[in-house]
């Protein structure tokens, strides 16, 4: 028997259908350990040594994992392919090692960018080790969260009783907001007016124009400081005769927007649908983990926490075939556009962009 550990029950349910009876898929329900809220959980004087503690919520799920691990030949850590997923895999492995349950057992780290049968099977066939740099990044972030929050929050509570705790990110964000508000408070507003002229041609079509010169002088932002300046300008231009002396046209090319990253997905969902970031990510999480389609649980999008804009070769081939079959070669570029343009600086950028797992599925079919 092989034990596969993921972080969520929805993901476990989907993967279990793909792998069959030789595998048991269990969920850790997120992180299983954390730094206890007490002094000394991170020791800066001792190479930032960190003390981890299993939280009460995770104990019952860890019992299920440990019981299954005892009877398993192989432990497969299949948590999400990002920093937090790598950290969960590391915590689970460390916990099982402390319980002396890994002796004579294989431990593999498996990742997949989408929850489809092909991707899961390919991930199982190509295991790797836990990535230490991602774990180090998680530890650095968690240590900073603790050190900032644990040391600053008590000071904050004495100054502002009943306030929330101070954090690594929100404390800096609050500073930026404060500085911006101070700039707004000292800002001295300055009045200015703009002047546009709307002409009509012999076909009664409107032509919108902007005044760029008046009496030989260039019109700038603050040329018209008040309504009197505008009235003076109007009296000069109303009775003049105007002619079109030259027409020039330019062709502008605009590339389509790049594939979605986490931030651009959230921005578009906000501007187009009015969704907040939390709602957007909840919906994306469901689409990633899978929904039931004709009795089968299928992941509809790739992993939704990514800074990368690259797309796999298989997906590009699928997209190009779809365009050719449905729209013709007129809409198919000779070469696929490259939006990354550089080597990924970190693991988040190395992930694929957010994309549909199967381009042939469309919203209308999903409604049926």
How does the language model describe each region?
Residues 1-142, 148, 156, 224, ...:
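Intrinsically disordered, low-complexity regulatory segments
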Residues 24, 33-54, 166-289, 328-330, ...:
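Long, highly charged, low-complexity internal segments
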Residues 70, 115-199, 246-253:
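C-terminal or mid-to-C-terminal helical accessory/interaction module adjacent to the motor/catalytic core
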